[in-house]
């Protein structure tokens, strides 16, 4: 029978506080790296709890900085914690955490945008996509400057089942600038509904967990921060290639305040624009006077399916780029003022 001590929750031995580590290594948040430290362990514990049960889990933490969330992850009883940190100033403090945890922390000095996460963890953790999510998690207080390109990269990897999703439906618990968090989770008719809403919600169950006031960070950002949890679906809500979905959604939200037919129209070259726009909306059974924020996921699914059929019939259609057409018109002095604005 297990002793009470064996059941005790894992706790790090006494260490300098996060604030003391910041002073010890003379750490300052770098504005150009969009760094904001979260030093309140009650808040970092709350973030980690939203990731779910991390007992014996394998976790990748993005941008650990001075190690606030890192400590909370270790205290959750993980088997292994991989931290990917770009800033060399934080490496000594992270090594200190590794020693205190008995070697549970593996530190990689590198950029998460280029790090090969498909090689991050043991192969025995891989689960079938149809199974429950693997015991692998991504957690991070993301710098504002990389949060959007990073989540788009990961969403594409969800679609392709590559990168961290080689292991299965890996869950993500991440912080974003509050406005980005609201876009990720915005529903139909919400003013924050955007390209990011569709791209995340067609692939994942997305939850806006809670908001952290900006004053909790050092230095204090001008905005609050939202904690978002994403779990990939077994079956995406739109079953088309990621690049195709992204193109359709991007074009439609190019004119977010206008009727949706404006955005649909720029999927097609000028000489056949009117005809194919009418055809696509008719076949998808979408009201051309709906605005992008009013379109449901079902609308986008139908639009993507019809566009795929049109591209199959005309292989050159998918490679058409509206912005390239505008650039050529501008060079020839034939563009309108409105078209010039779109190139800004």
UniProtKB/Swiss-Prot annotation:
Pfam families: RrnaAD (PF00398). The keyword Cell inner membrane does not apply. It is found in: Mitochondrion. S-adenosyl-L-methionine binds at residues 36, 38, 63, 85-86, 111-112, 141. It catalyses: adenosine(N)/adenosine(N+1) in rRNA + 4 S-adenosyl-L-methionine = N(6)-dimethyladenosine(N)/N(6)-dimethyladenosine(N+1) in rRNA + 4 S-adenosyl-L-homocysteine + 4 H(+). Keywords: DNA-binding, Methyltransferase, Mitochondrion, RNA-binding, rRNA processing, S-adenosyl-L-methionine, Transcription, Transcription regulation, Transferase, Transit peptide. The keyword Ribonucleoprotein does not apply. Coiled coil: none annotated. One of its GO terms (molecular function) is S-adenosyl-L-methionine binding. PROSITE patterns: SAM_RNA_A_N6_MT (PS51689). Its main location: mitochondrion. InterPro entries: KsgA/Erm, rRNA_Ade_diMease-like_C, rRNA_Ade_methylase_Trfase_N, rRNA_adenine_dimethylase, SAM-dependent_MTases_sf. Signal peptide: none annotated. Gene3D superfamilies: Ribosomal RNA adenine dimethylase-like, domain 2, Vaccinia Virus protein VP39. Residues 1-27 form a transit peptide. GO terms for biological process: rRNA methylation; transcription initiation at mitochondrial promoter. It is an enzyme of class 2 (transferase). It comes from the Eukaryota. GO terms for cellular component: mitochondrial matrix. Its EC number is 2.1.1.-. Belongs to the class I-like SAM-binding methyltransferase superfamily. rRNA adenine N(6)-methyltransferase family. KsgA subfamily. PANTHER family: DIMETHYLADENOSINE TRANSFERASE (PTHR11727), DIMETHYLADENOSINE TRANSFERASE 1, MITOCHONDRIAL (PTHR11727:SF17). Mitochondrial methyltransferase which uses S-adenosyl methionine to dimethylate two highly conserved adjacent adenosine residues (A1583 and A1584) within the loop of helix 45 at the 3-prime end of 12S rRNA, thereby regulating the assembly or stability of the small subunit of the mitochondrial ribosome. Also required for basal transcription of mitochondrial DNA, probably via its interaction with POLRMT and TFAM. Stimulates transcription independently of the methyltransferase activity. This is Dimethyladenosine transferase 1, mitochondrial.
